[in-house]
Amino acid sequence: MLTVDFIDDNAQIDAKHLPEIERLLIFAAEQEGIDEEAEVAVSFVDENEIQAINKAYRNKDAVTDVISFALEEGEDDFEMSDEPRVLGDIIICVKRALEQAEEYGHSFERELGFLSLHGLLHLLGYDHMNESDEARMFGRQDEILNAFGLRRDV
């Protein structure tokens, strides 16, 4: 089962939102066949912090909504151990999530779910660098969100 660790050093988000994000990520991991013990960290940051991370690691000096860092990237075989599989980190800019929820006409909860799931799918190897990969990733996102009950109209 997936364990989700939340990091919110600057009180960016109301804790009432965390249980649903955790349930969604556990549901998504199950949908993706992650049946062993695994961990993911979800951090909530402000615009300055995500811009600094984006610049340092992606060479893009701009605010973004979500960034993920896969700890297993490029590894084909994972050592068998008693330790949980550490998938990586998902970093969400709360202000961008609020803005995008308003822009897209859905709830803040739906946007948080979308961004959390988007980050998790990146950790699991999905990307959107070309048209076919984007269609695959975004289609999978919609399938999982809808199956979980977090549709666009929510």
Swiss-Prot record:
The free-text note explaining how the cofactor binds reads: Binds 1 zinc ion.
HAMAP family tied to this protein: Endoribonucl_YbeY (MF_00009)
Q: Which SUPFAM superfamilies match?
A: Metalloproteases ('zincins'), catalytic domain (SSF55486)
- From which lineage does this chain's organism come? Bacteria, Bacillati, Bacillota, Bacilli, Bacillales
Any GO BP: rRNA processing
Q: What is its EC number?
A: 3.1.-.-
Which GO terms of the cellular component aspect does the record hold? cytoplasm
Protein species of origin: Macrococcus caseolyticus (strain JCSC5402) (Macrococcoides caseolyticum)
Q: Does the keyword Zinc apply?
A: yes
What InterPro entries does this protein's entry cite? Answer: MetalPrtase_cat_dom_sf_prd, YbeY, YbeY_CS
The residues listed in the UniProt record as binding Zn(2+), with positions renumbered to this chain, are: 118, 122, 128
Q: Which family does it belong to?
A: Belongs to the endoribonuclease YbeY family.
- The name this protein carries in UniProt is Endoribonuclease YbeY
Q: What is its main location?
A: cytoplasm
